[in-house]
């Protein structure tokens, strides 16, 4: 697969992941673009979506896999992003930042371009200014336009992976573990009045 990041990130789902255990078989209440109710019961093992920064798998329901000559690959009901060997916390990343913004929450995320995975959304509940390794104040919320593929490609540092709950899709994607990331040139397109 294509190399998506210079950093050797692993992105995977694993039904046996400690603290994020989920069903070891597919349970689809309705058919969608990546799963079919006809796939219910499909056994799920660890699936590496990225390994070492390189694309490993895409989702395929049984019918799509048959058409493509691929193996059916259903999404596991958890998601882990990890940079092997990385450690440290958000505070550690802040301490090593000369000047930047600390984003604590992204929400109202919508797809703009499915071909590039371009998303738009808003920051919320805390955008902090960092100078010389310290948080020196808060600033406005912003609208952003970014592709998660581009974010991983530009990431220059990651902390240790910790359990996280996404604000936007937390009721659907509630088993995740992610590291804090340093991402130069994150695209803030405009100031938002959201608070």
What name fits each language-model region?
Residues 2-195:
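Dual-mode signal for accessory low-complexity, basic/Gly-rich regions
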